[in-house]
Amino acid sequence: MNIKMILLDLDGTLLRSDGSISDRTKQVLKSCQNRGIYVVIATARYWIGAERYIEEIQPDYEITTDGTLIHRHGEQIYSCSLDVETTNRIIQDLLTKNPETEITVATGRQVFWNSLHISESKKLHKAVYNDYSEPLSCHANKIVAELADYETAEQIAVRNHCRLQSYRGENWYAFLPEGAGKVQAIRELAKILEISLDDIAAFGDDINDMEMLEMCGTGVAVANAVPEVQAIADSITLSNDENGVAVWLAKNVLME
């Protein structure tokens, strides 16, 4: 096994249930980097929602915002976005369906949000308030809103020719540029670094990690992953609360 890059989903995979990363996991990741292996986070979170963990583990690259952005130490090197017209049309469609719906719009590392409780949010306390009463002048990498059902979200996605992403057990839906996602971002990064997909180990737990695990040479599911992810994984490690990522890397990459 010649692993040259490690791809890490955050929530439910690298992070424990309390949102922390164990010292053992941080130690193992640093040992991998010391051997010349790229450590990359690949998360649906916005950059500002992942910033705390970026500072903690100092990955070589950050794939965030459902694969629409790649940063290297905070510097953007790749972006896939909706045009300004589509961005504003989606926002208006969402507000037409429900004038009270909460909407977040990511543009690069900045996030707009029409919530009055931004300061109370653990993930998005650095978001900028916007009530969307005036059109935005930016390209959105990702728009997320809470909607009553999937059918409503699908109608908006079809009308605006964008990709729809849903999340396990939640009524939040993401609207992404057509063709965007973790898989496309990984392909772009592998091309930049001239690394074969066969030499990448990817770790995940949820439905939106499946393509990533299937595409890479080694797909690893944590024990708490949904059944669909475990079914397609090449290997299953311990759960996120049992240092599953670190245990697998120590055994199969560091040979400890």
Where are these regions (language model features)?
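Active-site phosphate-binding/coordination module
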Residues: 17-119
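Residue-level signal for inorganic ion chemistry
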Residues: 32, 43, 66, 143, ...
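Walker B beta-strand of ABC/ABC-like P-loop ATPase nucleotide-binding domains
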Residues: 7-8
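Conserved acidic, metal-coordinating active-site core of Asp-based
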Residues: 93, 97-212, 224
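Short hydrophobic/aromatic-enriched beta-strand-loop microsegments
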Residues: 59-67, 80, 123, 165-167, ...
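Short, structured coil segments at secondary-structure junctions
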Residues: 57-58, 66, 159-162, 215-216, ...
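Mg2+-dependent phosphoryl-transfer enzymes with acidic/Ser/Thr/Gly-rich catalytic loops
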Residues: 1-3, 16, 22, 176-178, ...
